Amino acid sequence: MNTRHLLFAFAALLPLAPHGAAQESPTLRKIAETGVISIGFRDKSIPFSYLDKQQRPTGYSIELCYRIVDAIRTRLKAPGLEVMLRPVTSANRSAFMLNGIVDLECGSTTNTLERQKEVAFSVTTFVAATSLVAKKAARIDSLQALKGSTVVSTAGTTAINALGDTAQAQGLDLHIIPGRDHAEAFSMVEADRALAFVMDDVLLHGLVAAAKDPGMYAIVATDLPVQPYGIVVRKNDPEFKKLVDEAIVALFKSGEVQQIYRKWFAPLQLPMSPALKKAIAAPTDSGDPAAYR
């Protein structure tokens, strides 16, 4: 099956009449009228949003989004609300949201002040550090050790933008290759086409864990900014964003998010960071990395 055109639909329901707060929210009104909520997912963003062995979208962000869907079903009194899952990429995820193709984007999208000009973000659900992965044999111990080398980062991400800015500011003279997705970027390091792959640490851990020989690779911290992740929603729909935030914050307050976190990150041996603990204790949708120090 071609995952680029993968489309999953669960349950079936005739279109619903708008109900209550749905009339105050364009997104809720659309969902109520069509009887469908459309979720954008990534196919290779382990452990946030990816396809499992049965080619079904799964992951930390997907699980959070299904909890949001439960809250929407409750708000609309529509227990049979249909969920449609659509694959998105770094290149088209914003356009899909702006054009109404997806109602929630559930992947590993970093909340930035620049992106907030086009879309809105839920309260932060994860805080990643920007790191690099290289083969241990290369003995790379810092971003500066890559000076004059060919490196790769995923196109359309905040990591590749930060890498370019830092390389220029520090005179690192890097040849930066944009990978189409995380898997392609990592494969360039595997094939020695790039000395290192610069990306969010948690995504690198997922890729290394799935590699043929994980022991060949080292993940190294950098001085690039942290990356706060959130669920993407449409801008200028505060009623819908409020519902999304309330569903996530409920998981924070109940402590259930701890169990969900362990489910997806314990296999990668990634304990919850102080920055994420802070964001859970005091929920925020800030796109400023300084807010997570």
Task: Briefly describe each language-model feature range.
Residues 62-71, 137, 144-145, 149-150, ...:
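Extended ligand-binding regions for polar small-molecule ligands
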Residues 38, 44-47, 57-74, 110, ...:
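Bilobed "Venus flytrap"/periplasmic-binding protein-like clamshell domains
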Residues 8-15:
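Bacterial N-terminal signal peptides
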Residues 24, 78-95, 138, 176-188, ...:
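Short helix-initiation/N-cap motifs at beta->coil->alpha
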Residues 24-105:
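Extracytoplasmic small-molecule ligand-binding "clamshell" domains
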Residues 66, 77-145, 285-292:
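Acidic, polar ligand-binding/catalytic clefts
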Residues 92, 106-117, 161-169, 188-225, ...:
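A ligand-binding cleft/hinge motif common to bilobed small-molecule-binding domains
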Residues 43, 126-137, 201, 209-248, ...:
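Periplasmic-binding protein-like
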